[in-house]
Amino acid sequence: MSSAGNKGSDAEQCATIFLQQQKLTLLERNYRCRFGEIDLIMREGDTVIFVEVRMRSSDRFGGAAASITAAKQLKLTRAARHYLAGCEGDFPYRFDAILISGERENEIEWIRNAFDES
C-alpha cells in the first residue's frame, strides 16, 4: 500500500500527463513559497493555469471537489500572486482543479476556472 505522499505524487503525475495530452505545457510542479504550495503550474497559449490536484478514494466526505476549501483557495491565490510577481509581463491566469476520485483512480475530472480570487 502506498503512503499518502506517494499517492499525492502519483496523482500529480497522472494529472500532468493528462493535461499535457490536452496540449498544456508544464511550467512548474510543486511550486512552494511562504504562502503555500501550488501542485502544478501549466500554460495554455498565453494563459497561466494554477492547478490544484485532488485525489479521493471515496465520496464519503464530499469527494475531491469538496476538499478544496475556501481556506485552501485563499492559500492558492496568494501563492499564485507570489509566482506571478516573479514573472516578467502581465499574463491572464486562472485556477483549475484536477479531481481524481472513486475506487478507480483512472477517472479524471478537469474543472476549468474552478474558483476565482473573490
Curated annotation (Swiss-Prot):
Pfam families attached to this UniProt entry: UPF0102
SUPFAM superfamilies found in the cross-reference section: Restriction endonuclease-like
Molecular function GO terms recorded: nucleic acid binding
Record-linked InterPro entries: Restrct_endonuc-II-like, tRNA_endonuc-like_dom_sf, UPF0102_YraN-like
Similarity comment text for this entry: Belongs to the UPF0102 family.
HAMAP family listed in its UniProt record: UPF0102
Stated name of the protein: UPF0102 protein NE0711
